[in-house]
Amino acid sequence: MDYNKILQGKYPAKQHAKRVSDYIRDKIPNATGVLYLEGRATKMIEDNDSEEHFRQRRYFYYLTGCPLADSYVIHDMDSSKTTLFIPPVDPESVIWSGLPVSAEEALSNWDVDEVKYTNEINATLAHVGASKANATLYAIPNQVSEKVTFLEFDHKNFSILKEAIEVTRVVKDEYEIAMIGKANQISSRAHELVMKKVKHVKNERELEAVFLAECISNGARDQAYHSIVAAGRAAATLHYVANNAPLDGKLNLLLDAGGEWNCYASDITRTFPINGKFTTESRAIYDIVLKMQLECIATLKEGVVWDDVHTLAHKIAIDGLLELGILKGDKEAILESRTSVAFFPHGLGHYLGMDTHDTGGNANYADKDTMFRYLRVRGTLPAGSVITVEPGLYFCNFIIEPFLNDPKHSQYINRPVLDRYWDVGGVRIEDNIVITKRGTQNLTTAVKDPDEMERLIASS
């Protein structure tokens, strides 16, 4: 798909500001006033004169599309006017960093009505506050600089703006979906390039370098999260990030990695054989996980209850593990006992957007039901949301051993058969899915058919 055509226009910041304002008015009838947000400030590395890697504050970006550090924005709820404040020229820094973005350039680049410099912020706030009787200033706690003052505003609300942005971010517009799609295009190609290189390198770190280089060379300079490049049994560790172990003697590689496109994330996982050919045990587990993913995706559309889809994934896993003989007994009893959590301990997926684990979802990490404790999304899925579908099966001794020592669970686990699967490590397959009124759109194009992956690896 040609996402570039959609992305030729400006990021729809004012549309987002309207949605946020409408949410506030829905909660506070007749609400009036100003939304105030700050971009992330430049930060220095501790005990060093170099800057930390910059990552724009997502709340600010949602209402501006502006990637500049040390910037502010005001959105007038009544007039719908958005004013962006960017850093002025600092003559002392020009020799080192060059000229910054000018007000004229900023007005051309981003969906705002006026651009001023940050040294005008307090005077502008004072003028706006004095001209609006009984107006409220809406801001986010701990995201207001000490030098910024709201003295002229009769009322200040620090409780609803963050909530309003987090809720409205769940449903994406066409532009946002194109951003996630663009990140997926680049990252999918990077995943396939890693598959082509896997037989020709000796260490996980070399494959991480391949992925990063492909993303950066195609414009995805930042990663959405720390890449997981896990060979062999390391793939049973969900968030393994050492990425520094040799590949020799190991069966499979689990690659969980995704680049960003202008602050929007991709989150993709593929698992494939290091030598280009799945073992019998690895292929059996892969086929179960792929079935889990495909059948779960097939059920998705607006209004589907995510908890039910997660349950379906466990049912498919149980059926598959019973067929292999790893599990034994009645499948309904196994489901009720939650024994399948030993092999599939995490949730089926999470919302995706500007953050990898995006806002919304209503997770309940205190849930006493272990099958749902780590499910990051609960309840119905709205059209326009983007969610990952990432089932997995893992053979982690540390996790499974307590189940083997508990009669409640051990009665359903066939230890002699299980022992043949430890070297499989873990298998996870993850795609990024747009929920529509009648179905889905899969943004992830990286190959996942096991025969195709084997051919791709062999072709290199």
From Swiss-Prot:
Its cofactor is Mn(2+). Mn(2+) 2 binds at residues 256, 267, 430. GO terms for biological process: proteolysis. The keyword Transferase does not apply. It holds the Pfam family Peptidase_M24. It comes from Podospora anserina (strain S / ATCC MYA-4624 / DSM 980 / FGSC 10383) (Pleurage anserina). Catalyzes the removal of a penultimate prolyl residue from the N-termini of peptides. Its EC number is 3.4.11.9. This is Probable Xaa-Pro aminopeptidase PEPP. The keyword Transmembrane does not apply. Binds 2 manganese ions per subunit. Belongs to the peptidase M24B family. Mn(2+) 1 binds at residues 267, 390, 430. SMART domains: AMP_N. Coiled coil: none annotated. Keywords: Aminopeptidase, Hydrolase, Manganese, Metal-binding, Metalloprotease, Protease. One of its GO terms (molecular function) is metalloaminopeptidase activity. It catalyses: Release of any N-terminal amino acid, including proline, that is linked to proline, even from a dipeptide or tripeptide.
